[in-house]
A protein has these predicted regions:
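C-terminal accessory module of base-excision DNA glycosylases/AP lyases that mediates lesion recognition
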Residues: 1-4, 12-36, 68-140
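Catalytic DNA-binding helix-loop module of base-excision-repair DNA glycosylases/AP lyases
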Residues: 36-42, 46-75
């Protein structure tokens, strides 16, 4: 996680507001919580998908997924999902909703393997999105 700058936020006066916004996001109030998190993160140069999606993914892995941009865009491209073209580094709800749609499709396509939650779905994205011909070790 974007630890160095995020520590300043989490140890500062707006820590509670950020955690509350992250909790609202995790509970499904994404339309209001996403802009609230962005407003709190922007002064720390941390208004990034990795930061915004991390806590909800940990707190509610049955509903939320972690957005690691490069590997996720690569995966979306490989499976020709609209997220390939919809992705934007700006924190827009339609981007996250597209990611959730991609996750839903993965869950459906892997139903016979009985994925437990989005942690399993994230693993599929990571392994496939990180795959490169001829490379034996995963990229860090």
């Amino acid at each position: 996680m974007e630890k160095t700058r995020l520590q300043a936020l989490l140890r500062g006066s707006e820590a509670d507001a950020f955690v509350r916004a992250a909790a609202r996001f995790a509970l499904g109030e994404m339309k209001t919580a996403l802009p609230a998190m962005e407003r709190l993160l922007r002064p720390h140069d941390d208004a990034k998908w990795t930061v915004v999606t991390y806590l909800s993914f940990l707190w509610r892995p049955e509903d939320h997924i972690f957005l690691k941009p490069e590997v996720t865009k690569d995966f979306a491209s490989r499976v020709q999902h609209p997220l390939e073209h919809q992705y934007d580094a700006e924190l827009r709800l339609d981007v996250y909703e597209s990611l959730l749609d991609l996750a839903k499709q993965i869950r459906h396509n892997f139903a016979d393997l009985q994925p437990c939650d989005m942690i399993d779905i994230q693993s599929v994205i990571w392994v496939v999105g990180d795959y490169r011909d001829g490379r034996e070790e995963p990229q860090e």
